[in-house]
Amino acid sequence: SNPSQLATAAGARFILQGTILKDPETVKVSTHLTDVANGRQIWAEAYTHPLEAGRLFATQEEIARSVVAAIGSEYGIIARRLSAEARKKPPAELDTYEALLRYYAHQISPSVESIQQCFTALERAAEREPEYGPVWSALATLHCQMYAVDAPGFEESLDTALRFARRGVLREPGSQLGRLILAYASYLADDSESFHEEIETALTLNPNSPYTVGTAGYFHIMRGEFDRGLPLLDRAIAANPCHPNWFHGGYVINYLRQQEYDLALLEVQNHSPYLSYWLPAAFAAILGSVGRIDEAKTYLEQVKEQKPDFGSRAHELFRRTL
């Protein structure tokens, strides 16, 4: 039987194949991924490394990490393909795995529409499988985001986020997502000890997950821990170009810290890393810093339209995001 027939017999949706070629100086690994459902090749890559006896195992590990990040990570080609299929179904009809795919799609590019769809899908999943920890962790993330933007109707969002995040870890102690989200909720709650404990646990569970590494880097930067955060963020973005837009918010903060306002502005323009009124707020702050006052005022008006009490609560609201 050919590999596709074997994959079909085993119930596999995707099959990874490859070849290894070498000469006295180099080794080349060519690999490709096929969707068994239609027989189409959906990803291919070639890796060339010097052929050094002392680095054979290191080379194997480097290639394996690259392949896993490209196809099997939270934002790898498999997750993106399945997520695209799940988007064709109404949120209330998604199964638990599809609900989590919808959650990860929302994390790449959050919007009001996507967060509503996530709430619907994940709440249904929690009703069906209340013992499945990652669903509670994903719901905790949404409540963290509602707290960060001070969304109306979510006055107890931080308490709910902490409760759901702890429930997720209790039900699935080895879940990297669970540990990561408990770190997020702990960060928002100013619990530094819990934040550092959970973020390091998340990284230890799988140090090769681009999403976890990048999120950890982002949180460290938000806490002012740039020496720890920036290398993690750089590593995550280099490993997977399909990373969430909000990762770039870490670079915005770093550029602002260094008073490199033009670079901060480019990050915001190119990646729109903020949700809700925080995007025009970022534009207003940066443009004001470079003397483009009229443009800054225009964005500030957008902030006031979306969040009328922003002026009187700016310090409190900034604390929820920075």
Stretch-by-stretch model annotation:
Residues 1-117, 121:
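Catalytic-center loop of serine/cysteine hydrolases
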Residues 118, 165, 182, 196-216, ...:
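Alpha-helical protein-protein interaction modules
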Residues 103-115, 140, 144-152, 189-190, ...:
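Short coil/turn linking the two alpha-helices of tandem helical-hairpin repeats
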